[in-house]
């Protein structure tokens, strides 16, 4: 029993020993881990503490720290990334310089801590112990600098509004939430996004109800705190103060005012004495730069006095030992001053007052912030309101949809202004974006001063991406794919320290308007610097860019269009045209047209055509025609002719004709022609003609003709003719006759004739005739003729004729003819004609033609047409046929082929029918003569 107890006791003792070792080891590791965690969580504790001094120093730490890419939530990872950030500072000379500059810009009490952190980063590896040491010193400084709370709060304004880094495009909101859990210490990186506690600090710093504190004043006062001296402001003499500016100042167009001061220094002034220049609260001396500087007063290459800016924005100058050894010292100062957007938030008149002691100057100016840019329902404006050249950061504030219009699928993009050497870096690493919704557009300040606590932060509800190099995109939260309220976008970004360019940013707002048309509106921001002081404000100009392509989410509604294959058109045109053209064309055309035309034309044409034809003609015709015709023709022709003609004609004719014809003809002619034509014609004619003709003819013809004709004609004719003809004919006959005849005839004839003739005649005739005849004839004829003729003729005729005719004829004829003719004719004609025609034609033709024409015409046409078509419509403002009307004479002497219009060549048709009529007349004349000879 005792053995068992001992063994049990021994086992228990051993168990206790092992447990002690394990527990001790865990406690040791736990203590080490707690110290490490304490180092990384130290800033969180400071941020959440109730002490105002501690909160102030935390804010100052943010200002002094450089910016890195912390994205992690856990405290341990935060510490690790902090070390990495410090290591990168040591590796990157530019970033290292930034860290050192941040230390210089911090308050006097923070300088040793920041300097220590910088030394550690540069010279040795970063360890948790080093970080802890730095934070411990920071905690001690909190207790030592409780009196500096106001100054550090002022610096917080600069630090909270300094740019922070976002993580990646897809995780912006998550990163921003994470950033609120860890605020880096003084030697760590600045937070990626402003947390809730920092927002409170900003609200307190910029609250208009509290005394105004300026971010730039601390650095200047702390760095250049003057030694104890006497304020001799009221001892300065010969003080002169002026304000130079126009009557209107445009702050967003780099507008500013100049403050000028001049004075004499009393001989009693010594080193350390000071004087004060009061600056009105409506002005500041930094513009958009985060740190304001005032120019030192120089005496040659020696400094007479150095200036700093106090917390109220006034300037305090401290004399150097230069005044100890000088007398009758005078000085002049000129400083650029800028409209303060926090204290002047609206457009209006402002009275500016500045001075030295009791010597002041005042001036009332109009402050004009100008309206945002608007294009249709899109409105936007932006401004660059802060630049920190020490830390290479900037802040841009953009008003999106300040008009409060209805915009569908809104989006904002930001990028560099094209064709500029902008030094901005836009990417997920160097750009942080905050978005605020504005419920009432009246809450927007015209100066673009923004207090973030006054608006709803909707950054977590928007989609922020970086689709291209140096470009970001913000897609706004929408209700039914549209927005109706303004938004504020605050961009905190970085500047490339190696760039030689200036800041130049473009913001573009996209969206659909009420008509579902995709629109865009852009605004450009740049920075101007004055007097080398590093101060300035944005140069703003609205830009309406080239409208973008459709994004694809919403199809725009196409513009109304009506494409009716049937169209009605009415046109009234008056044109003068002169053309000289030569053409070689082959066309197959089928046309169906109905037209009513009224035209007056004067044409001058010279044509040379070869369809086996060579012609030279000059004609001058004046015609007025009104025609009404309906014809249905179907023709196929194959012709080969050889002709050499020289004609000059001048004709004046007036005709009124009404005809209806239905013809079907097929002809094949070859200088030997064999033609078969069937025609059914009905004509009624009433003609009155006076003719005086004188002709000399020498003809030799051989003809073999056989004709059968059955004709039926009704005619009423009245003619007066005076003819003089000389003819030389050889048909085995020689005749000379002079005749003067006056006849009145009324004839009614019915004839049915069938004739076959073969004739060969040579005739030489000389005749002169003067005839006056009145005839009224009515004839019905039915003729069938077959003729074979061979004729050689040489004729020269001059004719002057004027005729008025009204004819109506009905004819039914069938003829077969085989003719071979060679003709050489020279004719000159002068005709004046007037015609009234109304025609409707349906034609189907196949033609091969080679023509050359030269015509000059004046035409006035009035036409109404209705056509069924499916074609491209030429816009009303485009020139007819795609050419400019001013080029109507450019085609002169051109050898380009005429366009194929499908219309028949009326000149050629007239010439052909004229030749056929002449041939028929000749054959008829010869047959009658032969009949007379037989009798």
UniProtKB/Swiss-Prot annotation:
List the GO cellular component terms. Answer: extracellular region
The region annotated as signal peptide is 1-39
Its family? Answer: Belongs to the serine-aspartate repeat-containing protein (SDr) family.
Species this chain originates from? Staphylococcus aureus (strain Mu50 / ATCC 700699)
The protein here is known as Clumping factor A
- Check the record and name the InterPro entries matching this protein: Adhesin_Fg-bd_dom_2, Adhesion_dom_sf, Fibrogen-bd_dom1, LPXTG_anchor, SDr-like, SDR_Ig, YSIRK_signal_dom
For membrane topology, the record states: Peptidoglycan-anchor
Where do Basic and acidic residues bias regions lie? 889-898
Its lineage reads: Bacteria, Bacillati, Bacillota, Bacilli, Bacillales
Spell out the residue ranges making up region: Disordered.
34-205, 529-906
Q: Tell me the compartments it is located in.
A: Secreted, Cell wall
Polar residues bias spans? 71-105, 163-205
Propeptide positions: 902-935
UniProt motif (LPXTG sorting signal) ranges: 898-902
Residue ranges with Low complexity bias: 47-65, 106-132, 143-162, 566-598, 864-882
């Amino acid at each position: 029993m005792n053995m068992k107890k001992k063994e049990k006791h021994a086992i228990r003792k051993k168990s206790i020993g092992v447990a002690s070792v394990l527990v001790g080891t865990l406690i040791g590791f736990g203590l080490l881990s707690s110290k490490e965690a304490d180092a990384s969580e130290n800033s969180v504790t400071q941020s959440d503490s109730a002490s105002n001094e501690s909160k102030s120093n935390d804010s100052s730490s943010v200002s002094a720290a450089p910016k890195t890419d912390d994205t992690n939530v856990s405290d341990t990872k935060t510490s690790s990334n902090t070390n990495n950030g410090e290591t990168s500072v040591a590796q990157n000379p530019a970033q290292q310089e930034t860290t050192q500059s941040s230390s210089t810009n911090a308050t006097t009490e923070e300088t040793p801590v920041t300097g220590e952190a910088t030394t550690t980063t540069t010279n040795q590896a970063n360890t948790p112990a080093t970080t802890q040491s730095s934070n411990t010193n920071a905690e001690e400084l909190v207790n030592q600098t409780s009196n500096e709370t106001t100054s550090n709060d002022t610096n917080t304004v600069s630090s909270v509004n300094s740019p922070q880094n976002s993580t990646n495009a897809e995780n912006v909101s998550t990163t921003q939430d994470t950033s609120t859990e860890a605020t880096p210490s003084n030697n760590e990186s600045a937070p990626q996004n402003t947390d809730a506690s920092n927002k409170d600090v900003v609200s307190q710093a910029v609250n208009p109800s509290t005394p105004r504190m300026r971010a730039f004043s601390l650095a200047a006062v702390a760095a250049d705190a003057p030694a104890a001296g006497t304020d001799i402001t009221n001892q300065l003499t010969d003080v002169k103060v002026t304000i130079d500016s126009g009557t209107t100042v445009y702050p967003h167009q780099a507008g500013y005012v100049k403050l000028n001061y001049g004075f004499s220094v009393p001989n009693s002034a010594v080193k350390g004495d000071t004087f004060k220049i009061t600056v009105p609260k409506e002005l500041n001396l930094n513009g958009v730069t985060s740190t304001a500087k005032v120019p030192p007063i120089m005496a040659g290459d020696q400094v007479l006095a150095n200036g700093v800016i106090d917390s109220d924005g006034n300037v305090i100058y401290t004399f150097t030992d230069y005044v100890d050894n000088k007398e009758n010292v005078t000085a002049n100062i000129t400083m650029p001053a800028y409209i303060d957007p926090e204290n002047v938030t609206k457009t209006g008149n402002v009275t500016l007052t500045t001075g030295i002691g009791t010597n002041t100057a005042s001036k009332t100016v109009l402050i004009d912030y100008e309206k945002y840019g608007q294009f249709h329902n899109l409105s936007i404006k932006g401004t660059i309101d802060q630049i920190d050249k020490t830390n290479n950061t900037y802040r841009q504030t953009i008003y999106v949809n300040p008009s409060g219009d209805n915009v569908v699928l809104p989006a904002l993009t930001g990028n560099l202004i094209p064709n500029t050497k902008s030094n901005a870096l836009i990417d997920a690493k160097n750009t942080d974006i905050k978005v605020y919704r504005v419920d009432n557009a009246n809450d927007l300040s015209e100066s673009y001063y923004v207090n973030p606590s006054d608006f709803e932060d909707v950054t977590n509800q928007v989609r922020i991406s970086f689709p291209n190099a140096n470009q970001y995109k913000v897609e706004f939260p929408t209700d039914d794919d549209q927005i109706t309220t303004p938004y504020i976008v605050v961009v905190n970004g970085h500047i490339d320290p190696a760039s030689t360019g200036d800041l130049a940013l473009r913001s573009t707002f996209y969206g659909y308007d009420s008509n579902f048309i995709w629109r865009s509106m852009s605004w450009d921001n740049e920075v101007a610097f004055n007097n080398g002081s590093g101060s300035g404000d944005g140069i703003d100009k609205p830009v309406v860019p080239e409208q973008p392509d459709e994004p694809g989410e919403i199809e725009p509604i196409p513009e109304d269009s009506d494409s009716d294959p049937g169209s009605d058109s009415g046109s009234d045109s008056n044109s003068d045209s002169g053309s000289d053209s030569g053409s070689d064309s082959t066309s197959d055309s089928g046309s169906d047209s109905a037209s009513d035309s009224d035209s007056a034309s004067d044409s001058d044409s010279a044509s040379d055509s070869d369809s086996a034809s060579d012609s030279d003609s000059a004609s001058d015709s004046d015609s007025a025609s009104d025609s009404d015709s309906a014809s249905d023709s179907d023709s196929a022709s194959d012709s080969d002719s050889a002709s050499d003609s020289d004609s000059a004609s001048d004709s004046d004719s007036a005709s009124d004709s009404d005809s209806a014809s239905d013809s079907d003809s097929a002809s094949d002619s070859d200088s030997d022609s064999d033609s078969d034509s069937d025609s059914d014609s009905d004509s009624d004619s009433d003609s009155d003609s006076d003719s005086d003709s004188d002709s000399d003819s020498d003809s030799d013809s051989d003809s073999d003709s056989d004709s059968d004709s059955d004709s039926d004609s009704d005619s009423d004719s009245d003619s007066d003719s005076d003819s003089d003809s000389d003819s030389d004919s050889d048909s085995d006959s020689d005749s000379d006759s002079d005749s003067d005849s006056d006849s009145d005839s009324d004839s009614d004839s019915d004839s049915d004739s069938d004739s076959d003739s073969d004739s060969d005649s040579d005739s030489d005739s000389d005749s002169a005739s003067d005839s006056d005849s009145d005839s009224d004839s009515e004839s019905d004829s039915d003729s069938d003729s077959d003729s074979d003729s061979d004729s050689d003729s040489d004729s020269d005729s001059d004719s002057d004729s004027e005729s008025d005719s009204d004819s109506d004829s009905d004819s039914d004829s069938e003829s077969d003819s085989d003719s071979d003719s060679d003709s050489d004719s020279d004719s000159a004609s002068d005709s004046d004609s007037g015609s009234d025609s109304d025609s409707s034609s349906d034609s189907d033709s196949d033609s091969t033609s080679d023509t050359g024409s030269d015509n000059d015409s004046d035409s006035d046409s009035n036409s109404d047409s209705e056509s069924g078509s499916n074609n491209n419509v030429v816009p009303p403002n485009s020139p007819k046929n795609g050419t400019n009307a001013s080029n109507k004479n450019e085609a002169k002497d051109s050898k380009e082929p005429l366009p194929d219009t499908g219309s028949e060549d009326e000149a050629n048709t007239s010439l052909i029918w004229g030749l056929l009529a002449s041939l028929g007349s000749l054959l008829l004349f010869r047959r009658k003569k032969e009949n007379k000879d037989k009798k």
